[in-house]
Amino acid sequence: MSLKDQLIHNVHKEEHSHAHNKISVVGVGAVGMACAISILMKDLADELALVDVVEDKLKGEMLDLQHGSLFLRTPKIVSGKDYSVTAHSKLVIVTAGARQQEGESRLNLVQRNVNIFKVIIPNVVKYSPDCKLLIVSNPVDILTYVAWKISGFPKHRVIGSGCNLDSARFRHLMGERLGIHPLSCHGWIVGEHGDSSVPVWSGVNVAGVSLKALHPDMGTDADKEHWKEVHKQVVDSAYEVIKLKGYTSWAIGLSVADLAETIMKNLRRVHPISTVVKGMHGIKEDVFLSVPCVLGSSGITDVVKMILKPEEEDKLRKSADTLWGIQKELQF
């Protein structure tokens, strides 16, 4: 009789049923691992699967997380280069791809990452045909479109992390200026995640008090307080962090875990995330841009109709045109 048999009397033989709240992360670079640890710390999954092509790094990251099991509430952490480890996922987060170099625009990464997605997406779909796909790899808006096209999924199940982080950065910087926690500073950044994102100044408020009503020059060149600089800092922030530490990881990891929580718990919170915007704000092409979306366990169920100023709509359409110009040239 083994020690285990002496210690434990078995009452019921469990059939090996699969996890009920499984999350998979594709890519165990800095961003993928920041997503993984943020998700583990929020107790969102009963199983976490990691996938990558670099096997030693992958196994090392898995073991390192498993060694912290005592301090976590996620009983199963697995990894493999084969996508069978991701089977039956509720949510699959894709962070894999070529990394943005210092000074490189997100759009420059495109074709390099499309080729990577041609391998990843069909494998994800094969093992988790009912999952939600959350795309994080840059340029996120275009790659979300690519994932949608390759997967054949309905659009509500293919989500780009989009401006969830840009808006968080904006609210942080707004909070720094006002001496108020970002949770109480409300403001939305929409459009492209990156250089042509659009700050919606008309909606910026604290406790329902419109800052633009108090300070009409806000966000314009005439503004003596230079609030436009806050949006410029948001746009520059990734470049600054990349210049200083080589990559960004923690904020995007936390931002992705925030989205994962909304999905896994069916919270129906509104997030600025990337979805198909055809037919909205005068956009005629199949492009993905961030707009305020109601998010839950089936993915994106609704979009909040923002009231934008004509110049804000123009910027959004310009973003759409830029993205479409690139998308229509893609080979996949």
From Swiss-Prot:
Keywords: Cytoplasm, NAD, Oxidoreductase. Substrate binds at residues 106, 138, 169, 248. One of its GO terms (cellular component) is cytoplasm. Pfam families: Ldh_1_C, Ldh_1_N. It catalyses: (S)-lactate + NAD(+) = pyruvate + NADH + H(+). The keyword Iron does not apply. GO terms for biological process: lactate metabolic process. The lineage of its organism: Eukaryota, Metazoa, Chordata, Craniata, Vertebrata. The active site is at 193 (proton acceptor). Its EC number is 1.1.1.27. NCBIfam families: L-LDH-NAD. It is found in: Cytoplasm. Homotetramer. Interconverts simultaneously and stereospecifically pyruvate and lactate with concomitant interconversion of NADH and NAD(+). NAD(+) binds at residues 29-57, 99, 138. The keyword Acyltransferase does not apply. This is L-lactate dehydrogenase A chain. Pathway: Fermentation; pyruvate fermentation to lactate; (S)-lactate from pyruvate: step 1/1. One of its GO terms (molecular function) is L-lactate dehydrogenase activity. Belongs to the LDH/MDH superfamily. LDH family.
